[in-house]
């Protein structure tokens, strides 16, 4: 009798999971850069974080994490990371401030290239993009694996650090440009940040700095209202491949 009740409970649990739309979307990270990257993950809306919130990814290595559905969050790549004598872990770009390899619910300090994904329930329509709204630190792309609909890759393959204007440059200890600020971060003005009184698309056109980002990476979000050519969709429960230096 106990076995029958246990079996029934198991079937009931599976049915609840199935009909509630529970589904894990595999998200794979691949590093094609010539240097090590430390990916970070951040779940939105103060919901539970993924099982991996930060890890080391050497050149040529791939690693995966499962995201539930529905789910929404962002991914980033930290560079030039090290651990000091006290054991504190920090990165020169996109540091999440946790003091550890794991970000533990902390986001990337800008400037940072971001991949944003919103996973729908029940195989509905997912949304995803590469965003440079918080600036740029390394090339990234996101591509659905499987799924139905358009399901095109969104990519920013250019190294914007090489053409970053002087006012936006972030330099490393060796004097090289290691990241490129957004105009909003650099100047903190409403016309660049799309904040009042410039908080509508018609009052916040893309500045020249954003146009430079857009020229280098046409598929990426370059400023707050840049969504017509930069938001991508896919349905049918696809997996996702995020590539550093595609």
Swiss-Prot record:
Equally expressed in the abscission zone and surrounding tissues of both fruitlets and leaves. It is found in: Secreted. Residues 1-24 form the signal peptide. Induction: Up-regulated in a tissue-independent manner following treatment with propylene and wounding due to embryoctomy. One of its GO terms (biological process) is defense response. SUPFAM superfamilies: Osmotin, thaumatin-like protein. Pfam families: Thaumatin. Keywords: Disulfide bond, Plant defense, Secreted, Signal. Disulfide bonds join 33-245, 81-91, 96-103, 151-234, 156-217, 164-180, 184-193, 194-204. May be involved in protecting plant tissues from pathogen infection. Belongs to the thaumatin family. This is Thaumatin-like protein 1.
């Amino acid at each position: 009798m106990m076995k029958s009740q246990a079996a029934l409970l198991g079937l009931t649990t599976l049915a609840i999971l199935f009909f509630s739309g529970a589904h894990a979307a595999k998200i794979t990270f691949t590093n094609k850069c010539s240097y090590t990257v430390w990916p970070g993950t951040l779940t939105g809306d103060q919901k539970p974080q993924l099982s991996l919130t930060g890890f080391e990814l050497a050149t040529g290595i791939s690693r995966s994490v499962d995201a539930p559905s529905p789910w929404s969050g962002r991914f980033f790549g930290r560079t030039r990371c090290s651990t000091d004598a006290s054991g504190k872990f920090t990165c020169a770009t996109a540091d999440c401030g946790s003091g550890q390899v794991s970000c533990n619910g902390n986001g990337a300090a800008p400037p940072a290239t971001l991949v944003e994904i919103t996973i729908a329930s029940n195989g509905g329509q997912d949304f995803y993009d590469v965003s440079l709204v918080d600036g740029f630190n390394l090339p990234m792309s996101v591509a659905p694996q499987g799924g139905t609909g358009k399901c095109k890759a969104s990519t920013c393959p250019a190294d914007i650090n090489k053409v970053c204007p002087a006012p936006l440059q972030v330099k490393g200890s060796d004097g090289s440009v290691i990241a490129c600020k957004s105009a909003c971060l650099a100047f903190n003005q409403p016309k660049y940040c799309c904040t009042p009184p410039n908080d509508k698309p018609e009052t916040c056109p893309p500045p020249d700095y954003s146009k430079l980002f857009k020229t280098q990476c046409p598929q990426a979000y370059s400023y707050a209202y840049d969504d017509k050519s930069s938001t991508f969709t896919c349905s049918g429960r696809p997996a996702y491949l995020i590539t550093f230096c595609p």
